[in-house]
Amino acid sequence: MKNARIVILYYKLSFLILFLLLKSALLLATEDVIYNLKFKQLSAPYSLPTNEVQKVYQDKDGFIWFATRNGLCQYNGYETTLYKSNLYSPDLLTTNSITCLVDDNNNHLWIGTSEGLNVMDKRTGEIKKYKAPYLSNNVVSALCVTRDNTVWVGTDNGLCRYVAEKDTFVVCGDDFGDSRLRYVTIKSLLEDSDGDLWIGTWAQGL
């Protein structure tokens, strides 16, 4: 009986030592990954039009987009392509101050700015523009495309939903939904796994 207890104790100690060794190895491997992270800076004037980047977004095709205060950049892993209004293309965007980005299932990139909404056809590069009164406000600070491909637009003066069949926007509180959102500044939008839309606001909570 005594020998049986010794054998059991031996196996318990062996298991404990093995567990501690594996845990230590895992921690060391994790630290090694953390300490060996490599950063590469993309900065103006070589890759970006400005160092003020307001949003980084990866679209469904894998391209990385940078929303900056001086234009929109597309990064393909090797080089950047700049989209901005300038002397040669004065009306390419409603403004070069880009605030947010999202793409839908129809190859459209939705571009929020401080002076309206721009929608780029990624196949042709053509850009369509929307401003108030189509929107509740020209300052677009949040965008979200839900699983049913509905586009939601958060502005400094309420929440809008795009109606593709009519190529127009309806305003939450005026045309549908809770009237308490009508004049609220929307800062962030997220659809969760249950299909609920989370709406982050300025000074009005969630």
Q: Predicted segment positions?
A:
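Carboxylate-rich, polar loop motifs that coordinate divalent cations or form catalytic acidic clusters
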Residues: 1-206
